[in-house]
């Protein structure tokens, strides 16, 4: 029986900032938040912090977002390793073209023991889950049989790697959209804000909305000044959404 894969979002990289010598400026932040402030001040050479309301890093970034000077958010980035997400959801995820992706390859990785992601609409209904898992088991059995026959068909191919790849790329056609995949995603702060605004909305598919909420929780720990304007709330059906009055690029 297919194993269920839980969603997991792991922070694996974030921007480090190194202040250039000779610039008469200091800040109360570090990393990507410091870089964001530096980039903004570089536009106007406002190193002396003449405005008390923007003298702190948080105050400065809040002002930047409020006035829509989003380009300075593009310098800092965050990378996540995401697992427990379905192929169906990553087809939506990769539509965000300002992200960079590296995803598990079904041509090189055999999927006969792959886990699956239960669609949110099934989770609270044991009968639907049973129907779903039965269908998944049947498709995996078909995949395994096709893989075996295709490997035999391509047995004359002397390159073992190519032989296996040819078999897997054909057999994967019967795998369900619910098959778990794993993916590395890198994006700058502006791209992540746009993703959260679009996909943490109540109008988004529930699975990718859960991903957006999980990413937001990590992003707030990395750069609170950039992402803490998003507020997470719970809908009547128990699912979560995140909204911000400053998310104007959705």
Swiss-Prot record:
Cofactor(s) recorded for this entry are: FAD
| Top-level division of the source organism's lineage | Bacteria
Q: Does the keyword NADP apply?
A: yes
Map motif ThyX motif onto the chain: 95-105
Q: Which UniProt keywords apply?
A: FAD, Flavoprotein, Methyltransferase, NADP, Nucleotide biosynthesis, Transferase
Known catalytic reactions: dUMP + (6R)-5,10-methylene-5,6,7,8-tetrahydrofolate + NADPH + H(+) = dTMP + (6S)-5,6,7,8-tetrahydrofolate + NADP(+)
Single Gene Ontology BP term? Answer: methylation
Which Pfam families does the record cross-reference, listed alphabetically?
A: Thy1
Q: Where does FAD bind?
A: 71, 95-97, 103, 188-190, 194
Gene3D superfamilies, per the entry: 3.30.1360.170, 3.30.70.3180, 6.10.140.450
Q: Which residues bind dUMP?
A: 92-95, 103-107, 172, 199
Could you tell me which residue ranges the ThyX domain spans?
7-233
Role this protein plays: Catalyzes the reductive methylation of 2'-deoxyuridine-5'-monophosphate (dUMP) to 2'-deoxythymidine-5'-monophosphate (dTMP) while utilizing 5,10-methylenetetrahydrofolate (mTHF) as the methyl donor, and NADPH and FADH(2) as the reductant.
Family according to the record = Belongs to the thymidylate synthase ThyX family.
Q: What is this protein called?
A: Flavin-dependent thymidylate synthase
What is the phylogenetic placement of the source species in the record? Bacteria, Bacillati, Actinomycetota, Actinomycetes, Mycobacteriales
Q: Which gene encodes it?
A: thyX
């Amino acid at each position: 029986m297919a194993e269920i894969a839980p969603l997991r979002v792991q922070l694996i990289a974030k921007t480090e900032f190194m202040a250039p010598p000779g610039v008469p400026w200091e800040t109360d932040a570090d990393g990507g938040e410091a870089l964001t402030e530096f980039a903004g001040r570089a536009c106007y050479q406002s190193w002396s912090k003449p405005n008390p309301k923007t003298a702190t890093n948080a105050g400065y970034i809040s002002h930047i977002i409020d006035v829509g000077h989003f380009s300075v958010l593009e310098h800092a980035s965050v990378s996540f390793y995401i697992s427990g997400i379905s192929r169906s959801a990553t087809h939506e995820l990769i539509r965000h073209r300002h992200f960079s992706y590296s995803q598990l390859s079904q041509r090189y990785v055999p999927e006969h023991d792959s886990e699956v992601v239960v669609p949110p609409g099934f989770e609270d209904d044991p009968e639907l889950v049973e129907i779903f898992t039965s269908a998944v088991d049947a498709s995996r059995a078909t995949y395994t049989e096709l893989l075996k026959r295709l490997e035999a068909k391509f047995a004359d191919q002397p390159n073992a790697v190519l032989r296996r790849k040819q078999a897997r790329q054909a057999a994967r056609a019967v795998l369900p959209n619910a098959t778990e995949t794993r993916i590395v995603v890198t994006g700058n702060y502006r791209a992540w804000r746009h993703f959260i605004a679009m996909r943490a909305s109540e109008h988004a598919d529930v699975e990718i909305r859960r991903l957006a909420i999980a990413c937001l929780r990590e992003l707030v720990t990395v750069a609170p000044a950039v992402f803490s304007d998003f507020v997470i709330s719970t809908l009547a059906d128990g699912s979560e959404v995140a909204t911000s009055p400053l998310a104007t690029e959705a």
